[in-house]
Structure formats: structure tokens, C-alpha cells
Amino acid sequence: MEQEIDQIVQAITIASDPTQASLYQQALAYISTIQQNANETWRLALHIFVDQNTEGHRKHPAQARFFALRVLDEFFDNRFEPLDHESFQAIHQALTAYIQSEYVVGSAEADASFLRNKFSHTLTLFFLCTYIDQWPSFFTDLFTLIRPTESATRSNFNRHISLLFFHIVLEISGEVADQIIKSARPYNAARHARDARVRDAVRDRDAARINAAVLTIVVEGAEQMANLHKSETSSRGPRELEGAVEVVDWGIRTFGSYVGWIDINLTVTPTTVPLLFNLLADSSLPIRLATSVSLLRIVSKGLKEPGDKLQLLKVLSLGQVLDALEAKTRAQQIEREESYREALGKLLNVLGLELAKLVDDCSDEDIRAEASTYITQIQPVMLRFMADEYDDTCSTVFPLLQNILTTYKRHRKISSNPLDESKRSFLASLLQVLLAKMKWEEDADPEDADEDDNAEFDKMRKELRTFLDSILAIDQVLVTDAVKTLALDTITAFKNGVSIKWNDAELGVYLVFIFGEINKSMTRIAGGKGRAAFCQAPAVVDKDKRKATDYSDYPLTTHGEMLLALVQSGVASFPHRTVSLQFFETASRYTDFFKIRKDCIIPTLEAMIDTRGLHNENLNFRSRLFYLFHRFIKESRNEIPPHISGNIIDSMRDLLLIEVEIPAAEDTEIDPLSEAIKNSQFDSQLYLFETAGILTSLLCKTPTQQTAMLLSLVKPLMDDLSVSLQAFSKGGQDLLPIVKVHHIIMALGNIAKGFPDYPTSIPEGHILPPLEIFTEVAQAILVCLEAMNVYKPIRDATRFAFARILATTGPTVTSYIPQLMGNLLAHFEPTELVDFMNFIGLLIHKLQKDMFDVLDQLIGPLSAHITSLLTQPVSGTDEHRAHIETKRAYLALLNNIMASKLDGIFTSERNSSNFEVLLESMQRLAEDVSDPASEKTAIMFLNRSVTVWGQPSSSENGRETGHGLPGFERFIYERLVQTCFRVPSLPQFNLKDGQMMVVLHEIANLLQVICKIRGHEAYNFFISVFLPSQNWPSETALDFMTKLRDLDGKGFRKYFTELIRSSRTS
């Protein structure tokens, strides 16, 4: 055995030293085998842990002994039956001797304190295996060791054994009663039953003695602490005080660990309650925190009788205690002790929730009334915790507050009586606390703060908003008056020159910002959305008279008054960017207000454009303003006088310069071009280009001026584009010209995006934008694409820009599409396929029949490529996702073609040879139940196919682009009908799956379309050929055909679903 032990110890030493590379892995594998075979190796482990040398010291190093405990853990942890007698005796004697030598007379592993915690866990596992049948005297034996035999000792109890006892009880509580620990490991019925038996046995045999021992040691430790505090000059020094604090701390933790699973009459007594309250106010923070947890567990302990629970809470009188402690700690504000106030808040929260359970669940009216009174009594202290400057403390009472407000809302719904004064007073006080908590700290700096800090503040504001919304549902006037008063008082004070702190100003503006949200119900009552939210206009204004109506004649709503005061106050000039940013956020959110108070537009625009906004020195601030300015202009464009749009553009020209910097490569695995393209500042700048396009579009009634303005925006970009293309053509590795071309193409696309879409039918008197300029832009972009089509970012930018130019110019640039497609497909990555098909779908939507020739050339190669792609095997999650996305985009494209009546491309001279292959591909996808969404879309395509090509070949039924195809009926009867009945019969077709039900409904639609298009012929086929071949009884077949012919779509879908469901269960 000695040789084996030495071998294990040597392996552990090697495994603890990764520098021994040659033997490291071998040693790890060896000791892993030792641990896995704990049933055979536990004796070796026991010796390694307890053996001593001739001098009485532990024989083996600490890391070896720690590993030995892990082996013993493995041996005990998987054992749910008693040990054999010989094994039990060997372990019992060894561990008892170890405790005697190390804890009773020794230093309790002073040189390796981590072994203490590990040993207490191992001993606990041994206890769980043996307590019921083999070591029932476990606690009795332990208690005899706690009191030292030497009467000269200053302490009555052995400190080491006391702490070991505490740790063991804590471990036992964790193993047999802690639901968090239990839920964290896989359920094991044998373990669950064993733990329940141990828990019951401890309750019956030793619970009272354990509790008495814990409290006795705690009381002695507390007395010792008090004596040491009195004699601060004692030579015993702080070490003894530290030791006493540790004992009391662990003792109270132990007490708190078992109060939830032993008799409450043991833990809540005339002795324990005063002790706990004394310790709750102790000078030691760890003791106070441990005591608060113990009290929390007492309060939350479940009792069968509501009366008993109420009596428990009355005995504790926690409300009064917490009131006093909250006031005391708030006055002291001791640094680093905020965790104590947080613990007190949690305790109050649980107390309130337990009382609320009595109010909600108890049938005894007296108990409910008394519990409700107690909740009312603790509301003031709850509000004081809510007002705490630390968010962690404030949020401890959120669940209780939510419960109280939910109760108020519930009563409000069932009663039309006014809210009683006490509740209204509480809500008014709460409202003031909430508004104060929504404010930034004065010394905070949102601009320089960590993103996580700002996110936490925003999260807190949102949570406070939910409470505000709850009060709103209870007493709307109370909330709106409070918010309005605080916002207007702050704004007015600033306007009048009163010195306002930045955080007060920001809150005032923020309240105007959220008023539209918290006041939704009032705006609905007043007439709803839009202008009606800001002025008291008639509920109905004749549609023809709306444009001529002067809404400024109508009085403002409350929100309208707040916004008017906000604009007129000049708060946009507040010398703190957080305040001015909040102003701009508010202005851009409520643009409908500016439609009724047009005199507010110019001052707001001025603030947005000058150094308060777009031209602010702070880069991040400017970036956000680019978006807000764009939003304001876009939503208010019809209210902006066209004659000032040129001035606005001129004032922002310096911001339209495109500057490119190539970042230094930090990671060789990242594509440097993609990294250079990613630029959040440029992404924000694109909003300005679109805004410039919007402002230029406003000059539509003066075409010459509009052309000049558009040219002044586009020409510098086109010149820059030419210079960058020439630089690229010279060769070299410089990424700058490529990035510059990308950015310019994106900018040109965004300018086009600012113009309205080309009309489907041009109305009389409509003035088109300068199409010739956009044509030149399209040509220039194509030249760049042809030269740079090997670069994906250039292809992406071109696709975007062309989509926007086509939306603006309509068929004007259609002639460039073949060249565009050729260059986009010249170099193609699989990831671009979905974007490309979506792009084609957009062109179809915009250009309709003008896309026929392009699609005629494109659809054949594209279908062949995708069909090949979809038949390839898939490996990996990412590849599977890409496969599905490609399939869905392809099916969407095909359906777009059919919906736009461009179906002729599938049967054209160029593509007719592939038509049957396409139909077979669609049929396969329609039968693939592994992807119901794609399956449904494929059936939709087949549905449309029947409508177009399945018509009887007669001149009266023909149509120019969708006449029937001779022979298509064979495909319908031989293939599609089979599919309609094969799919629902597949074993994988799950009728309980909502997506599968959608597929089934689409199949029902297809059956009806077939019969509608083919008429009597189809009915004869079903009744005479298909259904008999499927062995349908003639009555069932006749019923099916009758329903298919006579029911509407909804009725037949319901019938067909029930038919399939019954056929699968029969």
C-alpha cells in the first residue's frame, strides 16, 4: 500500500506542475483513474489524508490530501445505502482520530485553510451515508468535543470544533433542503429519498439539540465580543475579537440555514428574537448581514395556518425594527456599509410580500384586514428605501411596490369610488420619489461614463417608468399633474434666468419626452394620434379640408403646452450636452407638434444645425444628431418652407465631406477591407446625405433650382469618385481608394433615397426630379463596379445605391440592369445570394413588366445554381441556416415573379426546356416537411402555377401572359394531387405543430384551385379515378367532393383538417 500511496502522491505533485511537460498528461490521466475508481481506491485516499509522520505532523503535502478528499467525496456522494461494517469502522475511526488530533488539540489545518472547508464537505457526505443506520450518535459525539476538558481555557467552547460543527450543519442544510443546490444537479430518485430520510431523522433526533448548541455558542461568542469591546486596551488584542466575530458570524449563518426546515417553535422563541435583533444592530457588518438573512428566512417560512403566519410576523415586529434601523443607517451613511441597507431593504420586501400573501390568499376577513393594516404601516419605510441614492438598495423593494400597485389597480377596476385619501397620499409621495430617482446624479457624466453605467441608468429609468404607468392606471390626474408641474416649473425657471442644475434640467426635458407615453390614454380619449395629441381640434376634420386647416387656431393640449414651453425656453442652449441632446430627442420624437406650431420649426432647426447640434465639437454627440436631424426633417418635410431648404443644405455642406482613415491591422485573421468599411461615424453621416436628398426634393416646384441644388451635391462626389477610381487603377495594395469608392456610392444612394418614389402612374401636372442627373450617377457607379467587382463591399454598395436610384427614377435606368447583373454575378460569394435575390425582388416590385427581359436572361442560370446548391449535403449549424435562408429567398423570388404576372419567363423560348425541372424542384420542396415555412411557400407557387398554366387550353380562357399550357393537366393529376394527399400522411407531419397546420391549409387551397380551374374534369378525376385508387369508400369520396365543390375557402380548410386528423387517428 505504501508504494501505491507514494505513486499517487508523486502523480499529484507532477499534475500540479504543468512545467513537467513530458509527464504532465500521464499524471493527470493516472489520478483521474484513481478518482473514477473511488470504490477501490478510497482506502488509499483515506491514508493519504489522515496519516501522520513520526513527529505527529501530516505525512503528505496539502495538494495530495486535498485530492484524497475528492476521492472520498466521489466514494460517498454516489452511495445511498449503508456502508459495510468493516468500511464504516475504518473510516469512522480514521476521521474521528483526525478530528481529535487536528481540531481538538491541533491547529485545524492552520497552514492549509482550504482543507477545512473541503473536509467539512467530505464529512457531511459521510454523515449522509451513515447517520440513519450506522452513526446515529454523530451529533452527540461532536458535542462532546466542543467543550474543552481544560478548565483554564478562556473560552467555554472549542473554537475549532464549533466552526467545524457550523460548517457541517450548513453543508447538511445545503444537501437536504436547499432547492437551488438540488435543482442545479440531475434528479436522482435514490438521492432524493435518502435526503428526505436524513432530513426527517435530524428533525426527530437532533434538531432541538443542534439549535440549542448553535444558539449557546452564538450567545457566548456575543458576550465575549461585548466584553472585548469594553476592554479595548486589553492585551488580548484584536485577534481574539476577530475570532469571536467569526464564531458568531458562522453561527448565525448556520442558524439561518436550518430555520426553513425545522420546527419554527425551536427557532422563534422569547430568547432568540431579542438575540437576533441585537445582532441585527451589531457593529460587525458580517454578523449584521448574516442575521438579516436568518430573519428573512424566518419571515418567508411557510406555515399551514394563516393565523400562525400572522402571529409569527406580529411576534417579530419587524416593521418597527426596520423603521428604526433604516433611519439610523440613513443618518450615519457609513462608507462601505451600503450592503447592510440593501439587506434591510430585502428583509422589508419579503415581510411585505408575506403580508400580501395573507391579504390575497386568506379567507379569514379579520386576518386579511390586519395584514393589510401592517402593509400600510410599512409603506413609509418602503418609500425611504425607494429613495436611497444607491440603485441596488432602491430596487430591493421593487417586488413589494409592484404588488401594492397591482392590488390598487385591481381594486380600482372593480370599484368606481374615488381613491381613499390615505392611498392617494401614499401614491403622491411615491410619485415624488419616482420622479426624484429618475434624475441623474449631479456628479455623473453621461458622456464619459462607461457604457454599462449608462445602460444601468437607462434600465433603472425604465423600471421606474413601469411604476409610473401603474400609478397612471390608478389615478391619471395625479400623475399627469405631477409630471406637468415639475417639467414646466423647471423649464420656466430656466427661461427666466434661474440657475438650474444640469440634472434637474435634463429631468425636466425628459419628462416632456415621456409625457406622450404616460399620457396615451388621455390622447386616445381626446381624439387619438397625430396633431390631436397636441391641440384640441375637432375629433373629425374633413379630409379635403385638413391641408387648409390652421391648427394653430386651436388651444393646445397639456403635452402641446409643455412642448411649446420647451422650445420657447431656449433649453437647447443649456451648457450641458446631455440636456441639449434630450431636447433634440424630444423634438425629433414629437414632430406632429411642429405641424400645428410651425413657428417653432425655425428655432428648432437653428439649434439643430449650429454648434448646439450638428456642428457640436463632440464627435459622438454629432453622430447622434445626424440621425435626429434626419428624423426631424423627414417627418416635418411638408412643413418646411421650400425656400429655406437650400439654406439648410448650405449650412451642412461642410459635414458632407467624406473622409477615410484606414485603421491599423490588429488581427491578421480579420479582412482589412471589411474592417476599414466598418465605420460608425460614416454610417451616421449617411443620414445627412439622405437629409440633403429630402431637402432637395422639396424644390420640386422650381425644377431649375432643384437641378442646380442636386448637381451641387452630386458633382463633388462624382469628381471624388473619378479621382478614387483612377488611384485604384494604378494598382498597388492601398485600400484607401476602394473604401472611398464604397463610401461615395453609399452617399449617392442615400441622396437618391431622400427623393420620393417614382409614381406607378404619373398624375397630371406631376414634376419629375432631375432624372438625367441620376442617370449619370448610375453610369458612374456601374463604371466603378465593373472595375472593382471583385470586392464584395463594392458589390453591396452598388446593390444598395441602384435599389434607391431605381425607386426614384423608375424605368429611366432599366437599360443598365443587365450590365449591373452581369457585374454583380461576375464574382459571387454564397453569402450574397440571399441579398441578391431580395434585390431582384425589389426591382420586380418597382419595375414590373420592365423587368421581363432581364429576368428572362437571369432566371435559368439562377435556378440551376440554386437547385444545385440545395441538393448538396449540409454540415454544421451555420451552413444549415444559410441553406434554409437561400431556399426561402429563392421561393419568395419565384412567388414575386408569379404575383407580378411575369410568369412568361418560365415558359419563354429561352427557359422552356428547364420548365419541367423547375416544377419537379417545387414539388420536392412542397413535400419536405423538415422546413414547413419553405414547404408552404413552395405550395403557394404550385397554387399560382395551376391558376396560370392549368387553365383549359381555349381561347376564351387564355390570357396574354398566363394562358394554359397543353399537357399541364397531366402534371396536376399525376403529381400535384398525389402530393396533396402524400404530405399529410407522412409520419413526420405533426398536426399539433402550428406551422404544419399552415401547410395543411395551403394544401386545401391548392385542391380548391385545381377544381376551380379544371372544373368538371377535376371532379370526375377525383370521384372516378383518384379516390377509388386510394380505397376511399364511395360515401366518403362523394362527401369529400361535395365539400370541395360547395364550401368556401375557410369552410373547406376546416373540413379538410378534420378529415386528415380523423384519418390519422383511425
From Swiss-Prot:
InterPro entries: ARM-like, ARM-type_fold, Exportin-1/Importin-b-like, Exportin-T_C, XPOT
Native source organism of the sequence: Laccaria bicolor (strain S238N-H82 / ATCC MYA-4686)
Protein name: Exportin-T
Entry similarity comment: Belongs to the exportin family.
Any one cellular-component term (Gene Ontology): cytoplasm
PANTHER family: EXPORTIN-T, EXPORTIN-T/LOS1
Statement: the UniProt record of this protein carries the keyword Ubl conjugation: no
Lineage: Eukaryota, Fungi, Dikarya, Basidiomycota, Agaricomycotina
Protein's cellular compartments: Nucleus; Cytoplasm
UniProt keyword Membrane present: no
Keywords linked to the UniProt accession: Cytoplasm, Nucleus, RNA-binding, Transport, tRNA processing, tRNA-binding
Pfam families membership: Exportin-T (PF19282), Xpo1 (PF08389)
GO molecular function list: small GTPase binding; tRNA binding
GO terms classed as biological process: tRNA processing; tRNA re-export from nucleus
Role description: tRNA nucleus export receptor which facilitates tRNA translocation across the nuclear pore complex. Involved in pre-tRNA splicing, probably by affecting the interaction of pre-tRNA with splicing endonuclease.
